[in-house]
């Protein structure tokens, strides 16, 4: 589809004259909790997403050791000078964003391993600091819409430049035992919203964060998987070590394009020998309908979440 055709689409899905302002307000999927409304398509009577409690930020769920709403990081003392590497305590390595608020070095996979820390509420720099991107919330008009095969999806109504922040993947932060419990309760027809983030530190340790927006979450829960995604998930820390799962544009995105990311956290949907053994033993894979040329034909699979249930006291 050409750029002109996509832009035309973005105008065609605007509300009709018959739609009242009250009706349009009711269609805000974000319930007024984001700084921009998130529309729903189609308007009027018809299918609607399954109800859930909206939250723009993480909330503490069962079994989690650290409350994601607590502020544990100290703030910087940049009052008279801008936050720059070398003087700002929040920027120990290099600047996270350029002058256009784009994530630096998108497209260089080696850069993804570097931690991203933003300034927080205790910092002296103020709300206009360039190191406050993810915490500023939505910057582009987005829309939840019904796809042909993938259920509900999320698309942009505006042009999004490569490197810009798009949205978070927010929900309940869970302990591992609770994650396993919820996974084991799922049927083959239930969608799985739980994401497992694993960060490997320099000393060989692995930091795990489990987020589930099934019951409490934000618009990130509507993002579908793609084997050739246009979004990249980056852990961004602001107030504490509990990371925000921030999604940035991996390339320029045109109006009307569906937003997607790789559920495996990579750009290649590969399967390990351990996962293959478990699948061969009867654990089914869900088909992938992304339509990409490199489509792996199935959704990513994390075998560690399907093991024997742990004792709740060990989470």
Curated annotation (Swiss-Prot):
The entry's keywords: Chromatin regulator, Chromosome, Metal-binding, Methyltransferase, Nucleus, S-adenosyl-L-methionine, Transferase, Zinc
CDD domains: SET_SETMAR
Domain Pre-SET, first and last residues per copy: 74-137
UniProt-recorded Gene Ontology molecular function terms: DNA binding; DNA topoisomerase binding; double-stranded DNA binding; endonuclease activity; histone H3K36 dimethyltransferase activity; histone H3K36 methyltransferase activity; histone H3K4 methyltransferase activity; histone methyltransferase activity
One record GO biological process: methylation
Residues annotated as domain SET: 140-264
Primary residence: nucleus
This protein's domain notes: In the pre-SET domain, Cys residues bind 3 zinc ions that are arranged in a triangular cluster; some of these Cys residues contribute to the binding of two zinc ions within the cluster.
Family (UniProt): Belongs to the class V-like SAM-binding methyltransferase superfamily.
Name of the molecule in the record: Histone-lysine N-methyltransferase SETMAR
Species for this entry: Rattus norvegicus
Taxonomy of the source species: Eukaryota, Metazoa, Chordata, Craniata, Vertebrata
């Amino acid at each position: 589809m050409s750029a002109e055709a996509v832009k035309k689409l973005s105008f065609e899905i605007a509300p009709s004259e018959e739609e009242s302002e009250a009706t349009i307000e009711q269609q805000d999927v974000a319930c007024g909790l984001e700084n921009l409304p998130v529309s729903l398509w189609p308007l009027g009577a018809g299918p609607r997403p399954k109800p859930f409690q909206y939250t723009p930020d993480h909330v503490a769920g069962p079994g989690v050791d650290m409350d994601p709403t607590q502020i544990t990081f100290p703030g910087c003392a940049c009052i008279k000078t801008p936050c720059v590497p070398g003087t700002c305590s929040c920027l120990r390595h290099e600047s996270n964003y350029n002058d256009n608020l784009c994530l630096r070095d998108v497209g260089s996979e080696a850069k993804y391993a570097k931690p991203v820390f933003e300034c927080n509420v205790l910092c002296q720099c103020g709300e206009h600091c360039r190191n406050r991107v993810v915490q500023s919330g939505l910057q582009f008009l987005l829309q939840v819409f019904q796809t042909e095969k993938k259920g509900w999806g999320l698309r942009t109504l505006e042009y999004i430049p490569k490197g810009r922040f798009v949205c978070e993947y927010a929900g309940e932060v869970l302990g591992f035992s609770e994650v396993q419990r919820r996974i084991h309760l799922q049927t083959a027809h239930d969608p799985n919203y739980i994401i497992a983030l694993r960060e490997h530190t320099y000393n060989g340790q692995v930091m795990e964060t489990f987020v589930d927006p099934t019951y409490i979450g934000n618009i990130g829960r509507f993002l579908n998987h793609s084997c050739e995604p246009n979004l990249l998930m980056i852990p961004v820390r602001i107030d504490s070590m509990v990371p925000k799962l921030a999604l940035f544009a991996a390339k320029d995105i045109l109006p009307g394009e569906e937003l997607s990311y790789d559920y495996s956290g990579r750009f290649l949907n590969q399967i390990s020998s351990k996962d293959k053994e478990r699948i061969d033993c009867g654990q089914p894979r869900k088909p992938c309908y992304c339509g990409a040329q490199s489509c792996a034909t199935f959704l990513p699979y994390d075998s560690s979440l399907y093991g024997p249930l742990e004792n709740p006291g060990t989470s």
